[in-house]
Regions:
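Active-site anion-handling motifs in enzyme catalytic cores
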Residues: 1-260
């Protein structure tokens, strides 16, 4: 919302398609009105969650389908069952508020220790350098006890999507601080443990009726790591329906491309 203006995406005679998006969180009616006006001027809008769709369903050009990443072809990715947990780390000061930083780091360190005791190897994964994921990983890693560090490695995404997907595929569990860490984990048949900094991940999990413990950065004091069961760490979900539904994001665009 910061610095928002009443944007216009109509851009002359060119048709515009806005696919795979969510809306929120938002604070002001003015911001909502600006986005509503902007979306009313594009050819097609396809949201990834029902919460966002319901906010704009009065517009005739608005649709909803499963998250667009479910449509990715991952058939060439080497999936393993290595007892490893991918932990997608975020920087609280960039994604939510710096006041959560200390408590977030303490909870991640507790989780790392908890998983190592259960026999997991750990990979701390950065999805976004510009939002300081890597800096946060270095801070957390520096606080891991020396006798546990041999079980922990780091992976920094550098634009090589296939390499990143293979890294995630070489695991059993994805602890998703980044929204799409959870979605990719589900696509690859992994168990997931979401870490929320806003409700956008929650909205999609609710749409999918996924029942898993959720670590909410905004309410860390109420989450007991020891409450996570072995069943929680090994639960799997059938997402074939979502993989098929996600293809619908492109249906209007495909029609347009066939005309040109």
């Amino acid at each position: 919302e910061r610095g928002d203006t009443n944007r216009d995406f109509s851009l002359g005679k060119n048709k515009r398609y806005v696919l795979g998006i969510n809306f929120g969180p938002y604070k002001t009616q003015e911001y909502y009105n600006n986005i509503h006006n902007m979306l009313s001027n594009v050819e097609d809008v396809c949201f990834r969650d029902k919460y966002s769709y319901n906010l704009f369903k009065d517009l005739p050009n608005v649709r909803q389908a499963a998250d667009i990443v479910f449509s990715m072809d991952m058939s060439n990715i080497k999936n393993t069952n290595r007892k490893r947990a991918i932990i997608s780390i975020i920087s609280p000061k960039d994604k939510i508020n710096k006041k959560y930083k200390k408590q977030y780091e303490e909870k991640m360190l507790e989780l790392i220790s908890f998983l190592i005791v259960k026999g997991y190897e750990i990979c701390l994964m950065s999805f976004c350098k510009i939002e300081h994921d890597e800096e946060e990983i270095e801070e957390i890693y520096s606080k891991i006890p020396e006798n546990q560090k041999k079980k922990v490695e780091k992976y920094y995404y550098n634009g090589n999507i296939e390499e990143a997907l293979n890294t995630i595929a070489d695991s059993q569990l994805v602890v998703g601080g980044r929204f799409h860490a959870n979605i990719i984990g589900l696509c690859l048949g992994k168990s997931i443990l979401p870490v929320l900094y806003s409700d956008k991940t929650l909205h999609v999990l609710q749409d999918m009726q996924i029942d898993t413990p959720i670590i909410d950065i905004r309410n860390l004091e109420s989450f007991d790591i020891k409450s996570i069961t072995d069943d929680d760490l090994t639960r799997h979900y059938d997402v074939e329906k979502q993989k098929e539904d996600a293809q619908r994001h492109f249906e209007k665009l495909d029609l347009q491309l066939k005309k040109t």
